[in-house]
């Protein structure tokens, strides 16, 4: 899992404000297909916003981060923001 400094988290949160949630953790939880989609989205975009379903445990957001080796940048309500540096970095994080 990627460790982020407070400055990096603030930077990523500001970038994430304009993003639409692309994925949703539904009642099926962290299915293999969901995790695969999240892996692809993280590799492609590095920063991914995910909706957490109404009847889903919020701990699944943390579990999804560890299973995909991503950093859980922030959670706000039922939305989680994930970051993982891709092989070809797109975002230039501050130090």
Can you annotate each of these PLM segments?
Residues 1-95:
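Positively charged, polar, low-complexity stretches
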